[in-house]
C-alpha cells in the first residue's frame, strides 16, 4: 500500500481563503471564514464585535429551543454558511445535508407542539415554585386569591378592619374592642328602680326596659346580672365584717367578790360576830385567848382566791339568814367534819371547867385539843392511859 502524506495548508492560504479546505467538516460545526484585513504595517485587524458570529451548536441544543427561535437561528445559520462557502463544493453539499436535518427536526417539532408547551409549562412552574425570602414574606403578608380560605396562623384574632366583615389572615393588626356603652343618669335611675322592685325581671319586662332605656334586651339582661353579683358581694363583705366585730369583743372586768352586796353583808356579819365573841371571851374567866383581829379574817377570806387547792365556801345560818365563810380542805372527810358542825346560837359552846387550868375543848367526836406549845420529846408511856 502506498502511503499518502497529508500536508496541512499554509497560513497564507488560510488567510487569503483561496485554498479549499480538504478536512471534513461536521454538519453541526460552523466555520465562518472571515477575511482578515491587513494594515499598511502588515498587522491583522480583527472584525468588530458587533458582527454576528454564531457559536457552533449541536443538533440536540437546537431541538431544545422553541420553533420560532429554531427558525430564526436556522435562517441566520444558512446565510452565514452561504456567504463563506461559495467556492467549497464539498462544504456546500454538507451544508445542504445539515439543512435537511434541521428541516426534518423542524417538521418533527411542528408535528408535536403539545410536548413543547408541556415542557415550557413545567419549566415556568418550576421557576414559580422556587421560594426566596422576599417571595415568602410577600406570600404571607399579601395572600393570593387562591389562598383566601387558608389561615396564615393557628390563632386568629379580630382586627379593627376585618372584625365586621370576616376573619383576618394575620394577627399583627391591633385588637378590635367593642365600644363600651355608658348608661345615662336617667336610664340608670329607671334600671335601679326596677331592680329594687324585682332583681330578676322576666323577658317581657326586659324588653319594655330596653325600649324605655334605648338599649337592647341582651344589654338589659347583662346589667341585671352584674347588679345581682355586686349586691351579693356587698352582702358577703358586710356579713364578714359583723362576724369579726362580734368575735373581737372587749374582755369583761374580773369579778370582785368583796365588791358584791352579798359579800359586804357577810363581812359586816362576820365583824359583828367577832365583836360579840370578844365580849364573851373577856367576860369569861376560863378563856384567856385574845380575840382574833379583823384583818386576819380579811386575809383568810382573800387567801382562797390565791391558792388553787383551797375553795371559799359559805355556811348559811337559817335564823339570821347570814353566810359564814368556811375554809375547805382538799380532803373530802375533813370537809364533812367541818360542814357538820352546827353554828346555831341556840347550841352555844359551853366552856368546860378544867381543874388543871389548861383550856380544853370537847368536840362532838371527843377529840381533845391540847394547848399549842412548841414540840418536845415525846414520851411513849403518856399514851397508855
Curated annotation (Swiss-Prot):
Q: Where is the composition biased (Polar residues)?
A: 24-34, 236-249, 299-312, 319-343
**InterPro entries xrefs:** HD, Homeobox_CS, Homeobox_DNA-bind_prot, Homeodomain-like_sf
Assembly description: Interacts with MCM1.
Determine if Kinase is one of this entry's keywords. no
UniProtKB keywords: Cell cycle, DNA-binding, Homeobox, Nucleus, Repressor, Transcription, Transcription regulation
GO BP annotations of the record are: cell differentiation; G1/S transition of mitotic cell cycle; negative regulation of transcription by RNA polymerase II; regulation of transcription by RNA polymerase II
Residues within the DNA-binding region(s):
176-235
Q: What does the record say about induction? A: Transcriptionally activated by SWI4-SWI6 heterodimer.
Purpose of the protein: Transcriptional repressor required to restrict transcription of ECB-dependent genes to the G1/M phase by repressing their transcription during the interval from late G1 to M phases. Genes that contain a ECB (early cell box) element in their transcription regulatory region are transcribed only during G1/M phases. In vitro, is capable of binding to the DNA of the leucine tRNA gene.
Where it sits in the cell: the answer is:
Nucleus
Question: What residue spans carry the region label Disordered?
Answer: 1-57, 87-113, 235-259, 271-385
Entries under Gene3D superfamilies matching the protein: Homeodomain-like
Family matches, as PANTHER family: HOMEOBOX DOMAIN-CONTAINING PROTEIN (PTHR24324:SF9), HOMEOBOX PROTEIN HHEX (PTHR24324)
This protein's encoding gene? YOX1
| A GO term, aspect molecular function | RNA polymerase II cis-regulatory region sequence-specific DNA binding
Compositionally biased intervals (Low complexity) = 10-23, 87-99, 275-284
- Organism name: Saccharomyces cerevisiae (strain ATCC 204508 / S288c) (Baker's yeast)
Q: What is this protein called?
A: Homeobox protein YOX1
